[in-house]
Amino acid sequence: MSLFSAVEMAPRDPILGLNEAFNADTRTSKVNLGVGVYCNEEGRIPLLRAVVEAETIRVAQHASRGYLPIDGIAAYDQAVQKLLFGAESPLLAAGRVITTQAVGGTGALKIGADFLKQLQPGAVVAISDPSWENHRALFETAGFPVQNYRYYDAASHDVNRAGMLEDLNALPAGSIVVLHACCHNPTGVDLTPADWQNVLDVVKAKGLIPFLDMAYQGFGDGIDEDAAAVRLFAESGLSFFVSSSFSKSFSLYGERVGALSIITESREESARVLSQVKRVIRTNYS
């Protein structure tokens, strides 16, 4: 009997599986509405002028290809912090934010989930209903039980505000709550500033751990406007997690341009947290 005789065929990814089916389809009139990528009229992913210029500069430098630091390119990490929290954020000046480059937003979520499993091994993870499918898979793979909180009301095509707050209030202290910071995937229905304040109040009162996921900064109302939820939580004094992705922003889907940011209570705490996050990264892909 082969070592792999009992291995079952895994189901296709609900999103990327559609792309595989599209590529296998021989019809010339097909349209790909599966994977969320921007294509021009020829069906190709355009390369942004800024990316072309950056690549040209980079190639001309003939830079060496040595190992990056475990937490990635320092200038990139700092730029991510400024985009998320604002260049003048007191949190940055106080050293209360650590940021590590990640393999896309998925990689940032994976790092965060693995680190949280060390911190809160018995926690429950709550994700919105509906949510990006990989949220459940990532946290379940890390060993967490995952449940839903009500979010979208199909009848009104709006947020189920009462249901969401009721479900968050019912979570035990120490539960991890995954929140879409902007451009909710898959509904596109976002919380208002007042909604975010209500969610923050519940999170603080119940002692929940917020994990904000932001893959579309700038695609909603603007760069700063889309970061409003992150900055609101930053002003609250809470410790929390932010996974961010710029793969779509730069039209560099295959480059996996992500980052994980963690907000701590002090510069000294940041140093300890970063040391442990780097260990998680090292055992994943560094």
Q: Model regions: which residues?
A:
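N-terminal "arm"/small-domain region of PLP-dependent enzymes with the aminotransferase-like
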Residues: 2-75, 79-82, 86
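Hydrophobic/aromatic beta-strand patches that form the interior of the parallel beta-sheet core
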Residues: 31, 126, 147, 211, ...
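Short acidic (Asp/Glu) and glycine-rich catalytic loops that position anionic groups and cofactors
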Residues: 31-35, 58-61, 145-146, 211, ...
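Short beta-strand segments
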Residues: 34, 180, 244
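Short catalytic/ligand-binding loop motif for oxyanion handling, primarily in non-cytosolic enzymes
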Residues: 39-43, 186-187, 251-252
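Conserved core of the PLP fold type I
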Residues: 57, 62-207, 211, 217-219, ...
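Conserved core segment of the aminotransferase class I/II
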Residues: 79, 235-286
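Catalytic metal-binding/acid-base residues of hydrolase active sites
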Residues: 215-216, 247
